[in-house]
């Protein structure tokens, strides 16, 4: 794992992305040069072909990323990979045909190519990607050693790390053992507890650990010298909260304390440069999306009116940045008497109040499109924590520590929590989503926003977080 523009990324996933992007470029270049070499007579041949394939290669790589093929927990799940590559094939085939047909460089060459060429080309690209992944994972299993971590602690926090690593097998990190340093009640598996018969540094060297993670339930009275010795000898020393953030890409609210938030790095989304850049992107993207989606908006408006009488749009009060209330604008997806009792209700899975058209709009998130109006007005951003209703905010703020911190930024149409956590309607669900929201606020960057937008396409395809 390493940080790139403040966001934690899997080294294995990044390596695969670079290798597989190279494979995409190579296959496209080889196929076009083989079939079109006689026609490419004007200008340098290589530069002409590279210009021809640059945009298709970029789009294919984005589609592959957007379908979740670089999810660090599923890099070697080949059944999942094969299914996603088939989806990529279906998405990319018409795009490749369209891009090459409209390319003004080689119109004559395009005319002689049959649909079979495009089928073969697209299939070759994704077969190449699959073979590259198999080859990389086979070689990496033998040649690449995972980052070895020794956990100092055997109590509740250490047990959480054990459960995490048991649930999600990572190619990047290996827990080599747990040290019960201050004789706390052991909650991790006893075979994994190693005995410290000497210095902590010597034990770390014996186990080949490159990092110590301090996961002690009570650090009072624990000597610092062993950790200082390890640090001075080049072994990384990490707190439990930092390790959890790095490995899960969310914050652990149950172990979080204000001092960690105060002293940890990040939380730069409010600086002038970041705020100005984010707002500028929001305005440009909102105008572009509105122009692009106007035909769809017209069709959706007609369908909603045909199914049920009532207003096209639904305005609802939500809590925005700094606790200011605003009216969020969405396509209406429920019956007009959805809250006839006057008591706010969370939407539930298979909610009977949702219309048939509304169910489709929610599943595809088309109902969120009118929120570009809120983005243009400055009430919302494209990416950020989802805004909640005042009734729920008041309740959740009482029950969940740090809940109010999510209102430090503008709420978003999509967000880090929405693409990582399924839709939920309970306090525990809200707590889990807050852990992702605070991670986003802490580690914001423009690149992170772009990655979230791309991953939103993946969430829509899988109906992940659909209501």
Which residue stretches match the model-derived regions?
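Short, glycine-rich, amphipathic interfacial segments at transmembrane boundaries or analogous
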Residues: 184-186, 244-257, 314-356, 414-433
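N-terminal hydrophobic signal-anchor/signal peptide
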Residues: 1-23, 27, 75, 131-294
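A hydrophobic, helix-centered structural microdomain
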Residues: 273-337, 374, 446, 451-467
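Membrane-cytosol interface motif
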Residues: 85, 89, 145-162, 311-334, ...
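A short, structured surface patch at a secondary-structure boundary
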Residues: 347-410, 452-460
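C-terminal terminal-structure detector
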Residues: 391, 398-467
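Signature of alpha-helical transmembrane segments in polytopic membrane proteins
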Residues: 1-144, 274, 467
């Amino acid at each position: 794992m390493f940080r790139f523009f403040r966001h934690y990324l899997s080294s294995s996933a990044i390596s695969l992305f670079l290798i597989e992007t190279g494979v995409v470029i190579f296959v496209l270049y080889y196929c076009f040069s083989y079939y079109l070499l006689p026609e490419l007579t004007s200008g340098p041949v290589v530069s002409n072909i590279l210009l021809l394939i640059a945009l298709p290669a970029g789009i294919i790589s984005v589609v592959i990323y957007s379908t979740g093929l670089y999810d660090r927990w599923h890099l070697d799940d080949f059944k999942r990979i094969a299914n996603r590559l088939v989806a990529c094939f279906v998405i990319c085939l018409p795009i490749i045909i369209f891009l090459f047909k409209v390319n003004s460089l080689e119109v004559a060459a395009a005319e002689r190519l049959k649909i079979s060429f495009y089928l073969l080309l697209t299939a070759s690209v994704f077969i190449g990607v699959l073979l590259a992944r198999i080859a990389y994972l086979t070689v990496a299993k033998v040649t690449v050693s995972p980052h070895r971590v020794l956990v100092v602690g055997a109590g509740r926090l250490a047990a959480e790390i054990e459960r995490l690593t048991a649930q999600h097998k990572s190619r990047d990190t290996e827990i080599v053992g747990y040290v019960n340093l201050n004789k706390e009640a052991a909650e991790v598996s006893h075979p994994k507890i190693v005995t410290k018969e000497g210095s902590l540094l010597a034990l770390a060297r014996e186990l080949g650990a490159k990092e110590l993670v301090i996961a002690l339930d009570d650090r009072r009275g624990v000597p610092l010298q062993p950790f200082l010795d390890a640090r001075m000898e080049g072994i990384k020393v990490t707190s439990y909260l930092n390790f959890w953030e790095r490995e899960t890409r969310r914050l652990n609210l149950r172990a979080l304390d204000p001092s960690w938030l105060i002293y940890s790095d990040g939380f730069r989304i409010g600086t002038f440069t970041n705020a100005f850049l984010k707002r500028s992107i929001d305005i440009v993207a909102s105008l572009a999306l509105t122009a692009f989606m106007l035909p769809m908006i017209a069709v959706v408006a007609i369908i909603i009116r045909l199914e049920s009488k009532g207003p096209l749009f639904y305005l609802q009060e939500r809590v925005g940045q700094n606790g200011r209330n605003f009216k969020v604008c969405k396509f209406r997806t429920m019956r007009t008497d959805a809250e006839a009792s006057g008591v706010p209700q969370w939407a539930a899975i298979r909610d009977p109040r949702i219309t048939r058209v509304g169910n489709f709009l929610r599943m595809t998130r088309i109902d969120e499109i009118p929120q570009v109006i809120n983005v243009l007005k400055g009430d919302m951003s494209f990416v950020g924590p989802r805004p909640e209703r005042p009734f729920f905010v008041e309740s959740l703020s009482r029950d969940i520590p740090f809940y109010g911190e999510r209102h430090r930024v503008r709420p978003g149409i999509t967000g880090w929590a929405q693409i990582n956590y399924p839709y939920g309607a309970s306090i525990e669900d809200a707590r889990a989503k807050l852990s992702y929201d605070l991670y986003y606020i802490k580690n914001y960057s423009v690149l992170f926003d772009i990655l979230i937008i791309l991953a939103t396409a993946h969430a829509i395809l899988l109906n992940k977080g659909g209501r």
